[in-house]
Amino acid sequence: MQEAALGMIGATVGGGGDGDAAVVAEQNRQMKGEIATHPMYDQLLAAHVACLRVATPIDQLPIIEAQLSHSHHLLRSYASTAVGFSHHDRQELDNFLAQYVMVLCSFKEQLQQHVRVHAVEAVMACREIENNLHSLTGATLGEGSGATMSEDEDDLQMDFSSDNSGVDFSGGHDMTGFGPLLPTESERSLMERVRQELKLELKQGFKSRIEDVREEIMRKRRAGKLPGDTTTVLKNWWQQHCKWPYPTEDDKAKLVEETGLQLKQINNWFINQRKRNWHNNSHSLTSLKSKRKH
């Protein structure tokens, strides 16, 4: 992986010309040595690896890590060929590597977008095929076929058009076999990775909003709670007037003075208190009406 990257960059920067093949090969080795010892080499390698990871199934990522763990041997080999560039050549190499890293970062973003879009489309297409097969035969594809994904996919509720008339998806294979249209284990692993990344992005994107809403709810709860001593005064009045717990305006004015609460807070407390004791209130009203009739 590193050798291929260094070779490609070396050929881009130091290649060309009609000189002898041996001279060109030596120039390429020197260029690789300069790149391997350049301060931006770590950034360059990280950018290459980031692009490679995008389309690499999860079960194959350890292969990349294994290659990176042995990279120091290759670096020592190339570093030994570095002879030192002139100031002008060094500046050109600096500029080239900086631009190349930027290109790789942009390429990684394009790869991510491409993989995500097509992976989701592939999942939905396979789901449609599985449903069609079930409708025709009543059979359900097994887990080993690679057709089923995690049940969490159902939560996405994505709708894609199924109008694919006139398009040949068979790829030269027998459509009745369904095999060529089903993802392999590696493809399923890649799709699962894309799904996890999408869920993480959605969670991160809405995290701040969720926290704001939660804080607003807690603020309103704190604002809605009355001090304990004030509720004691209100409860005492309630107990004394439980048969008809509807304070007059004069009663409310007196409660405002005693508790220090606002009139709106007192009104809300009595409304909520009557709701909490609705059954008892109904019984009291019925008794009161009966007494008035007699």
Curated annotation (Swiss-Prot):
Cellular-component GO terms for this entry: nucleus
Residue span, ELK domain: 197-217
Protein name (Swiss-Prot/TrEMBL): Homeobox protein HD1
Family affiliation: Belongs to the TALE/KNOX homeobox family.
Inducing or repressing factors: By wounding; up to 7-fold increase.
Gene Ontology biological process: regulation of DNA-templated transcription
Gene Ontology molecular-function annotations: DNA binding
Origin: domain of life: Eukaryota
Gene3D superfamilies, per database record: Homeodomain-like (1.10.10.60)
